[in-house]
Amino acid sequence: MIRIGIHGASGKMGYEIISNLKNNEQAILSVAYTIEPMPFDVGDAIVTNDLKTLFDNSDVIIDFSIKDGAVNLINYARTNPKPLIIGTTGLGSEGDELIKLASSVMPILQATNMSLGVAVLNRLTEFASRVLDGFDIEIVEMHHRRKVDAPSGTALTLATHAAKARNLTLDSVRVSGRDGMIGARSKDEIAVMSLRGGDIVGRHTVGFYNDGEFIELNHTATSRATFAKGAIKAAIWIKSKEPKLYSIYDCLGL
């Protein structure tokens, strides 16, 4: 059995992963790392706030924490290599560069979204952006009121795929909001808008708009379990991989 440690175990994703590990035939929960009191039962797993304990008792570590916590984890792993699944979003360019650097000594899979459906949506977005070259692209993401980062990492990934398909860099065309007399929409811009409210797990819409017609691609998550199952699948997959930075597409064969 593969021993999986959860970094950020007391959060919502930690709960979902731990719940989905209970009946898994290939992996078990070995360590629940948290700086907060554990709000639910983790069985025989070790509960700790010590990174050494987490690393010593895990074959693979799944991270769903916050930016500072994820950065600390990765820095520790650079001198104590261990396969990592990084699901924390909002790390910024410095965090992404740190992950690339760390992947030279351990296998790391970084994904802004662990679901199969979103992985397919990314591929569809790239295809549609290339084929529908003259269409305007607008992306809208919706999440629960407690989500702290905006736009979502998934929305930015979708926008990156759209820009890449048109040989553009996202930074050069991204629009985050519109207000006032801003003038007409430019040809290449890609808008990424965020809505927050209620308990929405996650909804992403990529719209392609032209005169006389439009297409909208949509993914709605109704349960965090879909992300948890994807993270566990990735953890099992990455255990035997060589040091490298992997994507969810590598794991899913897309």
Curated annotation (Swiss-Prot):
Its EC number is 1.17.1.8. It is an enzyme of class 1 (oxidoreductase). Keywords: Amino-acid biosynthesis, Cytoplasm, Diaminopimelate biosynthesis, Lysine biosynthesis, NAD, NADP, Oxidoreductase. PROSITE patterns: DAPB (PS01298). GO terms for cellular component: cytosol. (S)-2,3,4,5-tetrahydrodipicolinate binds at residues 144, 153-154. Pathway: Amino-acid biosynthesis; L-lysine biosynthesis via DAP pathway; (S)-tetrahydrodipicolinate from L-aspartate: step 4/4. The keyword NAD applies. NAD(+) binds at residues 8-13, 87-89, 111-114. GO terms for biological process: diaminopimelate biosynthetic process; lysine biosynthetic process via diaminopimelate. It is found in: Cytoplasm. One of its GO terms (molecular function) is oxidoreductase activity, acting on CH or CH2 groups, NAD or NADP as acceptor. The active site is at 143 (proton donor/acceptor), 147 (proton donor). It catalyses: (S)-2,3,4,5-tetrahydrodipicolinate + NAD(+) + H2O = (2S,4S)-4-hydroxy-2,3,4,5-tetrahydrodipicolinate + NADH + H(+); (S)-2,3,4,5-tetrahydrodipicolinate + NADP(+) + H2O = (2S,4S)-4-hydroxy-2,3,4,5-tetrahydrodipicolinate + NADPH + H(+). Catalyzes the conversion of 4-hydroxy-tetrahydrodipicolinate (HTPA) to tetrahydrodipicolinate. Belongs to the DapB family. This is 4-hydroxy-tetrahydrodipicolinate reductase. It comes from Campylobacter fetus subsp. fetus (strain 82-40). The gene is dapB.
